[in-house]
Amino acid sequence: LLIGQIARGIDGREAFQEVDFTQLYSGIAKWVTEIRDPKRIPEILAHAFSVAMSGRPGPVVIALPEDMLREEVMLPPQLPYSAAVEQAPTTEQLARLSSMLAEAISPIMILGGSRWSEEARQAIVLFAERQQLPVAVSFRRQQLFDHTHHLYAGDLGIGVNPALIARIRSADLIIAIGARLSENPSQVFTLFDIPSLKQNFVHVHPGPEELGRIYSPTLAICASPVSFALAVVDLPMAHLREADSIHRDYEAWTDVLPQTPGAVDMSEVMTHLRDKSPEDVIITNGAGNYSIWVHRYWRFRHYGSQVAPTSGSMGYGLPAAVAAGLRRPEKRVFCFAGDGCLQMTIQELAVLAEHKLKVTVF
């Protein structure tokens, strides 16, 4: 995030539009800085991208004093590129994970977070199939596993299937990949014992600060979902387990429509859209409770088919749909938005119309 700042030399005097951005953003950004010397632009931008992409990805804020922007300096024609720092499981960690899988009777895997890829998703599917692992997904991370797969168990968001909650509580091994297991997935921190789970707990996360932050893992692995998925796909097969029943529970939860009062039944609306739409449609939504019907009844099939906020920001759905339409113009995009949520960013309808995007707003 690049923000204009008052001129250098008058800061601290409450000049017109002066803001202490370090104080304002330090609680919600990974790094806040200011470029006071234009010669350092390549250095600071390279570091900013590295910080933003490494570990748990997050925002970086850079303030730009207005007088600094008017200076002329000689810089290289191409700025340096800083890739995200990658870490992978060690041989010892993989051996211990394999041993825990061999001993487990009722394991379950939970997928979440960011820094995934299509390759990682495919590798995790193969890993789950080889190990006969039921797979749940974290809050608004439903694109990470095909909902029609016989190992898919459901999502840990708002209005969770009680059968999934029971299955997790009775599990003897929980493997969380990329997920932090924060308020919504943990059902307001009631689903797992704190700080030590009664089950064996394997926590895989690219940010070391997240490992042991709330839950003490039996095995902590600092790795991105991509590097972990590619490392575990060829682990020895564990013994056969019965894993299909949890998918039948999911199907029952999403096929049986509860009776609701009123002329419009949103569960019927959602299942009708689901059954009549192409399987690769991209779904976006904002933060409101109206999204409960989307999360319960839509069956996500492909990676990249869901764009939704986990931070609780209203107004997210429409600009997300515009971005998806611009990025993948050949795809149909459905945006679900409540009235207040839509009005937060309703001006984006102009962009949608200007570019003639294949976006439908519900």
Question: Can you say where each PLM-predicted feature lies in the sequence?
Answer:
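Short, glycine/acidic-enriched loop or turn micro-motifs at the edges of active sites
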Residues: 208, 289, 342
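Short, flexible loop/turn segments with low-complexity composition
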Residues: 61, 239-251
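Short, well-ordered alpha-helical microsegments
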Residues: 117-120, 229, 291-294, 345-346
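Small/polar loops that bind or transfer phosphate-bearing groups
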Residues: 36, 111-112, 285-286, 308, ...
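Active-site diphosphate/adenylate-binding microenvironment
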Residues: 247-330
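Thiamine diphosphate
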Residues: 1-8, 31, 163-165, 170-183, ...
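Conserved structured core elements
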Residues: 118, 125, 223-226, 263-267, ...
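N-terminal alpha/beta PP-like core and its mobile active-site loop of ThDP/TPP-dependent enzymes
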Residues: 1-239, 272, 276-279, 351, ...
